[in-house]
C-alpha cells in the first residue's frame, strides 16, 4: 500500500519515470537464477511476491515508466557476502571477484564478469516489461589505484595498453 501511495503522489506531480533498484550489492528484488533475494527484503528468502513485477505493474497503471536500476560491480562487505553464504557470487565465482578495503567487487577486467552482467540484464529484460535499464557503479572503486587486478591485467590486458587505458576499455566494453 505504501508503494502505491508513493506512486500516486509521483503521478499527481507529473513524474513520469521511476527507477526501481532491482539489484543491490550481489542481491536482487526479483526472482533470479543468478543471485539471491535481497536480505533487506526477506532475509534472503523468497518473499511470497515479486517486487519488481509489482512495481512495474503499478507504475504502468499510472502511465509511469519503470526502469530497473542495477548496481554492477560492488558485491558487498565481508559481512554481507558471508550472510549470503553459498548463494553469493563470491562463493560461486571467487575468481571473478576482488576484495578491496573490506568490500568485494566483480572484476571488470575478467571477461566472465561482462558475460555475467549481460546475463543479469538479459534476465530482467526477458522476464519483465521494464521501460529501461539503469546501470549504476559502472566504474572501478574510488581508490582504483589500489584495486587488486594486476593478475587480470597480466592475463587479459594488452602489452600495448597501460593499466589505466585497459581499465577504461573494460568499462566501455561492459556498457
Each predicted region: which residue ranges?
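Active-site-proximal beta-strand/loop segments in catalytic clefts of secreted hydrolases
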Residues: 21-23, 69-73, 109, 135-138
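Conserved, mostly hydrophobic/aromatic
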Residues: 10, 18, 59, 66, ...
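Active-site and adjacent substrate-binding regions of carbohydrate-active enzymes
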Residues: 116-133, 141, 159-160
